[in-house]
């Protein structure tokens, strides 16, 4: 799991097995809060976007967000074209395809993902976030249908 802001990439969290609401909240504690602190975002100024996966919308996760003064951005279900992290993962996949030798195990895949994640330039994150008004406009123009994003 990864998170990023306008000019930064947060800490990458390795997920083993299937994530549930409890593990999600642990990741928020261990990765989101430190990333927010390191980014210099003032307390209460963080607006967090996530999809509507049940673990994200669980009572446990909602309570955690409230307790940590993090505003959630309302999000339409089934809208990956509006989800900038999906496009960042696509960028990572393209970078992973550049390795000439296939990874020999899960540990090596994780190592490579972390290497690519840590090398992401802030401009990549900035461009994705700044593309949001165009993305929203395209969805409105398509009346909720498919877009080029």
Q: Where do the PLM segments sit?
A:
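Surface-exposed helix-capping loop/turn segments at secondary-structure junctions
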Residues: 37-46, 121-127
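Electropositive, glycine- and tryptophan-enriched low-complexity nucleic-acid-binding patches
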Residues: 1-43
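C-terminal anion-handling pockets and recognition modules
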Residues: 85-149
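Short alpha-helical patches at protein termini and domain edges
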Residues: 59, 70, 109-112
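RNase H-like two-metal-ion nuclease catalytic core shared by retroviral integrases
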Residues: 50-52, 58-60, 74-98, 104
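Eukaryote-biased feature marking scaffold/signaling PDZ-domain proteins and nuclear chromatin regulators
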Residues: 7-10, 43, 68, 80, ...
């Amino acid at each position: 799991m990864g998170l990023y802001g306008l000019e930064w990439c947060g800490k990458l969290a390795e997920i083993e097995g299937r994530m549930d609401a409890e593990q999600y909240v642990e990741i928020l504690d261990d990765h989101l809060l430190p990333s927010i602190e390191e980014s210099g975002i003032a307390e209460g100024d963080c607006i967090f976007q996530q999809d509507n996966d049940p673990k994200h919308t669980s009572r446990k996760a909602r309570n955690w967000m409230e307790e940590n003064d993090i505003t959630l951005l309302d999000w339409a279900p089934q809208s990956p074209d509006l989800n900038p992290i999906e496009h960042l993962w696509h960028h990572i996949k393209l970078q992973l395809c550049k390795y000439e030798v296939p990874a020999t195990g899960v540990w090596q895949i994780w190592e490579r993902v972390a290497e690519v994640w840590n090398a992401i330039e802030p401009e990549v994150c900035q461009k994705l976030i700044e593309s949001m008004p165009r993305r929203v406009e395209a969805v409105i123009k398509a009346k909720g249908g498919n877009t080029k994003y």
